[in-house]
Structures are given as structure tokens and as C-alpha cells.
């Protein structure tokens, strides 16, 4: 059974490796990732994972995995920080407060059946000093990341509390992914 990873994220590739899985092909789906007007974060991240999966061609003998992660402050979706100004804004929003990190994974089995699961985790950061935000931005590790930070990097030192899936916060919830792969017939130990 062959596996296709529909993602260019090095974190998703690393996380699949933790399951002992190496994709046979990696393809980055090209879709519009803009939220729809009034779309809730939960609906958005599920739709993104499903659209990414549907955007990649798959052979009959292939299982496909796609995922998406978003950070939500209330109903507000914080996508990938495009530049330092946006990252600063995101970090100011999550400073000292709880926020949700939602990670959806969609697996399409060899028979074409798609299954999707959602992991919803909560993270609380300390209240940031302006100098801490600037120092973090200078590391570059949060650039292009949902919410403007990477939990697996130096941002982890700012976490005062979290609940949920650490791998989901990183970008691919392993529990949900493992179960979806097994239900799709992918051989896991």
C-alpha cells in the first residue's frame, strides 16, 4: 500500500515519521486557503483538510493524507503569519490568554472513501512583554506558522498551560492520524 502526503509541511512529514510512516510521494496541494465570510474556525480547518486532500490526484493503490492547522482566538481565525507585522499582531492577541489550536486530518483510502477527524487543543501563553515578542519574531521560527508561532520551538517556553494534542498543535494530530490510517487499511504496527 502506497501513501501520499498532501502537504509541504516539514512538521507533518516529521510527525508521520513518529508513526513509522514514510510517504511514497509528497505533493503540495494548491488551493485557496481564505476563510469564508462568517466561517467558524472548526468548520474552516475541516474544510481546508478536505479540500487539500481532494486537490491531489491519487492512484487506485494509494492512501492519501492531508492536514490543516489553525489558531483561533474566539471566532477569529489566525492563519499563517505572512510578515513580522502580522506575527506581532497575532502574538499580541494570544498573549496571556487561552486560545484554540485546531488541527484536522483527512485520509482518503484506496477505495476513495474520505474520513476526516479534528483535534481541538487549548494553549495559554504567559503575558508577553513587547521585548519578548520582538525577540521571538527575530528568531524567524514563527514566520509562516498558524498563529505566528511554532510550539515545538522556543515558543514552548512561554506556555503556562495546555490541554489536548501536542502533535496536533505542531500540525498533525497523531492519535487521529493513526486511527484514520488504520481504518483506511494502511499497515501500522
Language-model features: where?
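A short beta-strand-loop structural module common to alpha/beta enzyme folds
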Residues: 23-34
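Anionic-ligand binding patches
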Residues: 2-4, 40-189
Amino acid at each position: 500500500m502506497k501513501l501520499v502526503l498532501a502537504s509541504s509541511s516539514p512538521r507533518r512529514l516529521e510527525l508521520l515519521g513518529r508513526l513509522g510512516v514514510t510517504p511514497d510521494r509528497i505533493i503540495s496541494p494548491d488551493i485557496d486557503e481564505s476563510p469564508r465570510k462568517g466561517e467558524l474556525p472548526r468548520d474552516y480547518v475541516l474544510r481546508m483538510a478536505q479540500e487539500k486532500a481532494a486537490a491531489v490526484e491519487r492512484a487506485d493503490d494509494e492512501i492519501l493524507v492531508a492536514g490543516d492547522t489553525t489558531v483561533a482566538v474566539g471566532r477569529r481565525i489566525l492563519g499563517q503569519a505572512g510578515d513580522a507585522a502580522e506575527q506581532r499582531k497575532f502574538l499580541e492577541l494570544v498573549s496571556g490568554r487561552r486560545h484554540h489550536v485546531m488541527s484536522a486530518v483527512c485520509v482518503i483510502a484506496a477505495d476513495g472513501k474520505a474520513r476526516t477527524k479534528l483535534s481541538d487543543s487549548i494553549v495559554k501563553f504567559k503575558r508577553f512583554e513587547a521585548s519578548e515578542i520582538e525577540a521571538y519574531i527575530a528568531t524567524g521560527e514563527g514566520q509562516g506558522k498558524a498563529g505566528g508561532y511554532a510550539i515545538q520551538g522556543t515558543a514552548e517556553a512561554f506556555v503556562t498551560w495546555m490541554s489536548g494534542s501536542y502533535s496536533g498543535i505542531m500540525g498533525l494530530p497523531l492519535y487521529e492520524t493513526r486511527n484514520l490510517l488504520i481504518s483506511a487499511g494502511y499497515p501500522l504496527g
